[in-house]
């Protein structure tokens, strides 16, 4: 894929009022996307169905969402696209609505786990997946072309969806087995003052759980602030205080999950992915699981021991999904809590992932700690080393020798990951080993080889 001017790996994202997250750019982006979608519609029209393409726009709870929604709507309408406004719904809800309503595309206004000062815009294809690269490239090229407007008789219409949240709630519930319920289970659900504030608590309540909800009072400014999947310690405190069985933490757009048990222990994405896969193995063979460069070595070892393949993708759920599709595997995820179950949904979904974990626990009549007890997470040690200007760490002889020595010493007892920071001139030296002391000593050997 060629270098992009505006789009990153997850759409367009930045600070509100910056070069790309402003009303003027959103208007141009909406018009550009509309033109491309209209052209695709004409080229693939079969003579049946809608006269005009339709898209759905969903958003999280940031104050800037109103501005960006209105600008996108105007641009799309000017290009002759009908718009459905779903309001505040999780990112995976937009993927679901796009697919089930047979729409041309879905648009999400969210910066996920970032603070309210940021926002972003990303697209889903008609199949509820990421846009094909050629369509994304065409939209980006069209952004820099002059704004225009179709004739009055061809303008798109916009309307608010009254049932978007209800549709999504029912979809989430449909991924939980009909022969199970959550009766007698006491949950604390933290929606991060984000997109799931009005849907996630309903999902678990309607399946029978007693739910205490936190992070469900968005004011436009408090999304992800001290709550949600980025701050599970807040949830852990609430779970202990209320004597709950489990806690469920989502992030601002509800595609990320962390969980907490009744003791306050926090479970990250690696542990939750294992909980899901272990249950799926009782239904039939699981060919493999995709993690990332940051997935704990303990998960890789445990999956190998139970006969499940494992591959690492670059960090980012987009790359995890790409590798899952390439291999035909159904399960994957990140330590951060992006979990993908392609037998349930086309994209990562925190609420649905939590339901799959709960399915495992109900089937086994086990606690979360009991269910993942055979997964041994390896201690991790990371040292950040400043990179001197002009230093090519990939060809550094001292580092190469140190890495070879460390990897020989670890041999099946851990792993080494060396990568440059994407945001600052630093080299990240990470070692996972079967005990803390070995991880620390190994990471220090790598740092010493660079004179750190």
UniProtKB/Swiss-Prot annotation:
A GO BP term here is: UDP-N-acetylglucosamine biosynthetic process
Task: Name the residues annotated as catalytic in the UniProt entry.
Answer: 112
User: Modified after translation how?
Assistant: Activated by phosphorylation.
Record keywords: Isomerase, Magnesium, Metal-binding, Phosphoprotein
Q: How is the cofactor bound?
A: Binds 1 Mg(2+) ion per subunit.
Q: What is its EC number?
A: 5.4.2.10
Sites binding Mg(2+) sit at 112, 251, 253, 255
| Keyword Metal-binding tagged | yes
Signal peptide positions on this chain: none
Cofactor(s) needed for function: Mg(2+)
- Name the InterPro entries on file: A-D-PHexomutase_a/b/a-I, A-D-PHexomutase_a/b/a-I/II/III, A-D-PHexomutase_a/b/a-II, A-D-PHexomutase_a/b/a-III, A-D-PHexomutase_C, A-D-PHexomutase_C_sf, A-D-PHexomutase_CS, Alpha-D-phosphohexomutase_SF
GO MF term list: magnesium ion binding; phosphoglucosamine mutase activity; phosphomannomutase activity
Q: Which SUPFAM superfamilies match?
A: Phosphoglucomutase, C-terminal domain, Phosphoglucomutase, first 3 domains
Supply the enzyme class, top level. Answer: isomerase
Query: What does the UniProt function comment say about this protein?
Result: Catalyzes the conversion of glucosamine-6-phosphate to glucosamine-1-phosphate.
* Family label: Belongs to the phosphohexose mutase family.
Designated name of the protein:
Phosphoglucosamine mutase
